[in-house]
Amino acid sequence: KQCESKCIHLKMGKEAVAIGYLERFAADYERESGNISVPEIAEKNGIKIAVVGSGPAGLSFAGDMAKRGYDVTVFEALHEIGGVLKYGIPEFRLPNKIVDVEIDGLRKMGVQFEKDCIVGKTISYDDLHADGFKGVFVASGAGLPNFMNIPGENFVGVMSSNEYLTRVNLMDAANPESDTPVLQGKKVAVIGGGNTAMDSV
Protein backbone atom coordinates (compact mmCIF):
# COMPACT_ATOMS: atom_id res chain seq x y z
CA LYS A 1 0.00 0.00 0.00
CA GLN A 2 2.91 2.37 0.61
CA CYS A 3 3.84 2.37 -3.06
CA GLU A 4 0.25 3.29 -3.97
CA SER A 5 0.62 6.64 -2.21
CA LYS A 6 3.66 7.42 -4.41
CA CYS A 7 2.35 5.87 -7.64
CA ILE A 8 3.34 7.72 -10.83
CA HIS A 9 -0.29 7.53 -11.96
CA LEU A 10 -1.22 10.03 -9.25
CA LYS A 11 1.00 12.64 -10.93
CA MET A 12 -0.97 12.05 -14.13
CA GLY A 13 -4.28 12.64 -12.36
CA LYS A 14 -5.21 8.95 -12.41
CA GLU A 15 -5.87 6.45 -9.67
CA ALA A 16 -2.89 4.58 -8.26
CA VAL A 17 -2.28 1.04 -9.44
CA ALA A 18 -4.05 -1.10 -6.83
CA ILE A 19 -1.03 -3.32 -6.26
CA GLY A 20 -2.41 -4.68 -2.99
CA TYR A 21 -5.56 -5.95 -4.69
CA LEU A 22 -3.56 -7.36 -7.61
CA GLU A 23 -1.31 -9.30 -5.22
CA ARG A 24 -4.37 -10.54 -3.33
CA PHE A 25 -6.02 -11.66 -6.59
CA ALA A 26 -2.90 -13.54 -7.72
CA ALA A 27 -2.49 -15.28 -4.35
CA ASP A 28 -6.19 -16.18 -4.13
CA TYR A 29 -6.21 -17.49 -7.70
CA GLU A 30 -3.20 -19.71 -7.08
CA ARG A 31 -4.65 -21.04 -3.81
CA GLU A 32 -8.15 -21.69 -5.17
CA SER A 33 -6.85 -23.38 -8.33
CA GLY A 34 -4.95 -25.89 -6.21
CA ASN A 35 -1.83 -25.37 -8.31
CA ILE A 36 0.41 -23.92 -5.65
CA SER A 37 3.99 -24.06 -6.79
CA VAL A 38 6.86 -24.98 -4.49
CA PRO A 39 9.84 -22.65 -4.95
CA GLU A 40 13.12 -23.97 -6.24
CA ILE A 41 15.09 -25.49 -3.38
CA ALA A 42 18.87 -25.70 -3.22
CA GLU A 43 20.56 -29.05 -2.76
CA LYS A 44 20.33 -30.23 0.85
CA ASN A 45 23.42 -29.27 2.85
CA GLY A 46 22.71 -31.48 5.88
CA ILE A 47 22.75 -28.57 8.35
CA LYS A 48 19.91 -28.60 10.89
CA ILE A 49 18.31 -25.33 11.97
CA ALA A 50 15.79 -24.94 14.81
CA VAL A 51 13.15 -22.21 14.74
CA VAL A 52 11.48 -21.27 18.02
CA GLY A 53 7.96 -20.04 17.28
CA SER A 54 5.68 -20.49 14.28
CA GLY A 55 4.41 -16.95 13.84
CA PRO A 56 5.13 -14.72 10.83
CA ALA A 57 8.85 -14.32 11.57
CA GLY A 58 9.39 -18.02 12.29
CA LEU A 59 7.53 -19.20 9.20
CA SER A 60 9.27 -16.68 6.94
CA PHE A 61 12.68 -17.66 8.26
CA ALA A 62 11.86 -21.37 7.95
CA GLY A 63 10.86 -20.91 4.31
CA ASP A 64 13.97 -18.90 3.48
CA MET A 65 16.29 -21.45 5.09
CA ALA A 66 14.52 -24.42 3.47
CA LYS A 67 14.99 -22.77 0.05
CA ARG A 68 18.72 -22.57 0.80
CA GLY A 69 18.95 -26.30 1.51
CA TYR A 70 18.85 -26.35 5.31
CA ASP A 71 16.92 -28.95 7.33
CA VAL A 72 14.49 -26.80 9.31
CA THR A 73 12.37 -27.79 12.30
CA VAL A 74 9.92 -25.29 13.81
CA PHE A 75 9.08 -25.68 17.51
CA GLU A 76 5.70 -24.22 18.55
CA ALA A 77 4.54 -23.96 22.17
CA LEU A 78 0.83 -24.10 21.32
CA HIS A 79 -1.23 -26.88 19.74
CA GLU A 80 -1.69 -24.96 16.46
CA ILE A 81 1.00 -23.90 14.00
CA GLY A 82 0.81 -20.26 12.96
CA GLY A 83 1.45 -18.22 16.09
CA VAL A 84 -0.26 -14.84 16.07
CA LEU A 85 -1.58 -15.56 12.57
CA LYS A 86 -3.84 -18.17 14.18
CA TYR A 87 -4.44 -16.95 17.72
CA GLY A 88 -4.16 -13.19 17.40
CA ILE A 89 -5.97 -12.36 14.16
CA PRO A 90 -9.70 -13.09 13.91
CA GLU A 91 -10.97 -15.44 11.22
CA PHE A 92 -12.84 -12.64 9.42
CA ARG A 93 -9.58 -10.74 8.85
CA LEU A 94 -7.27 -13.65 8.08
CA PRO A 95 -9.02 -16.98 7.47
CA ASN A 96 -7.20 -19.96 8.96
CA LYS A 97 -7.43 -21.81 5.65
CA ILE A 98 -5.11 -19.22 4.08
CA VAL A 99 -2.56 -19.68 6.87
CA ASP A 100 -2.89 -23.47 6.54
CA VAL A 101 -2.12 -23.27 2.80
CA GLU A 102 1.11 -21.40 3.60
CA ILE A 103 2.04 -23.94 6.29
CA ASP A 104 1.33 -26.83 3.90
CA GLY A 105 3.62 -25.15 1.38
CA LEU A 106 6.41 -25.12 3.95
CA ARG A 107 5.82 -28.81 4.67
CA LYS A 108 6.17 -29.54 0.94
CA MET A 109 9.50 -27.71 1.09
CA GLY A 110 10.64 -30.12 3.82
CA VAL A 111 10.05 -27.98 6.92
CA GLN A 112 9.20 -30.09 10.00
CA PHE A 113 6.88 -28.87 12.77
CA GLU A 114 6.80 -29.80 16.47
CA LYS A 115 3.69 -28.62 18.33
CA ASP A 116 3.16 -28.42 22.10
CA CYS A 117 6.89 -27.97 22.58
CA ILE A 118 8.21 -25.13 24.74
CA VAL A 119 11.90 -24.58 24.09
CA GLY A 120 13.43 -24.02 27.51
CA LYS A 121 10.93 -26.31 29.25
CA THR A 122 9.84 -29.24 27.06
CA ILE A 123 13.23 -29.27 25.39
CA SER A 124 16.33 -27.29 26.37
CA TYR A 125 18.75 -25.29 24.28
CA ASP A 126 21.41 -27.90 25.06
CA ASP A 127 19.03 -30.66 23.90
CA LEU A 128 18.70 -28.92 20.53
CA HIS A 129 22.46 -28.86 20.09
CA ALA A 130 22.73 -32.47 21.25
CA ASP A 131 20.15 -33.35 18.57
CA GLY A 132 22.45 -31.88 15.94
CA PHE A 133 20.95 -28.44 15.42
CA LYS A 134 23.71 -26.06 14.35
CA GLY A 135 21.66 -22.89 14.65
CA VAL A 136 18.63 -21.62 16.56
CA PHE A 137 16.44 -18.77 15.35
CA VAL A 138 14.27 -17.34 18.14
CA ALA A 139 10.96 -16.02 16.82
CA SER A 140 8.94 -16.25 20.01
CA GLY A 141 6.94 -13.12 19.16
CA ALA A 142 4.87 -10.94 21.43
CA GLY A 143 3.12 -13.58 23.50
CA LEU A 144 3.16 -11.58 26.73
CA PRO A 145 0.85 -8.57 27.04
CA ASN A 146 1.73 -5.15 28.40
CA PHE A 147 -0.47 -4.24 31.34
CA MET A 148 -1.14 -0.71 32.58
CA ASN A 149 -0.48 -1.48 36.27
CA ILE A 150 -3.78 0.02 37.40
CA PRO A 151 -6.07 -1.14 40.21
CA GLY A 152 -8.51 -3.86 39.14
CA GLU A 153 -6.67 -5.16 36.10
CA ASN A 154 -6.19 -8.54 37.80
CA PHE A 155 -9.87 -9.01 38.69
CA VAL A 156 -11.79 -12.04 37.41
CA GLY A 157 -13.27 -11.19 34.02
CA VAL A 158 -10.51 -8.75 33.10
CA MET A 159 -8.16 -10.14 30.48
CA SER A 160 -5.56 -8.98 28.02
CA SER A 161 -6.31 -9.02 24.32
CA ASN A 162 -3.67 -11.76 23.99
CA GLU A 163 -5.58 -14.03 26.35
CA TYR A 164 -8.99 -13.12 24.94
CA LEU A 165 -8.07 -13.62 21.27
CA THR A 166 -6.15 -16.83 22.00
CA ARG A 167 -9.08 -18.30 23.90
CA VAL A 168 -11.61 -17.27 21.24
CA ASN A 169 -9.51 -18.28 18.23
CA LEU A 170 -7.95 -21.51 19.52
CA MET A 171 -10.22 -22.72 22.31
CA ASP A 172 -13.73 -21.92 21.02
CA ALA A 173 -14.24 -19.72 24.09
CA ALA A 174 -16.87 -17.56 22.32
CA ASN A 175 -19.13 -20.61 22.56
CA PRO A 176 -20.99 -20.49 25.91
CA GLU A 177 -20.90 -24.32 25.98
CA SER A 178 -17.09 -24.43 25.84
CA ASP A 179 -14.95 -25.34 28.85
CA THR A 180 -13.77 -21.76 29.39
CA PRO A 181 -16.31 -19.33 27.89
CA VAL A 182 -15.35 -15.66 27.75
CA LEU A 183 -18.84 -14.23 27.28
CA GLN A 184 -19.76 -13.41 30.87
CA GLY A 185 -21.77 -10.20 30.76
CA LYS A 186 -23.76 -7.76 28.63
CA LYS A 187 -21.51 -4.70 29.08
CA VAL A 188 -17.86 -4.84 28.05
CA ALA A 189 -15.14 -2.19 28.10
CA VAL A 190 -12.26 -2.45 25.66
CA ILE A 191 -9.30 -0.29 26.67
CA GLY A 192 -7.46 0.96 23.60
CA GLY A 193 -8.33 1.86 20.04
CA GLY A 194 -5.78 0.10 17.86
CA ASN A 195 -6.08 -2.92 15.59
CA THR A 196 -5.91 -5.41 18.44
CA ALA A 197 -8.64 -3.57 20.34
CA MET A 198 -10.85 -3.61 17.23
CA ASP A 199 -10.16 -7.33 16.75
CA SER A 200 -11.29 -7.92 20.33
CA VAL A 201 -14.55 -6.04 19.79
State each model region's role.
Residues E23-V201:
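Residues forming the flavin
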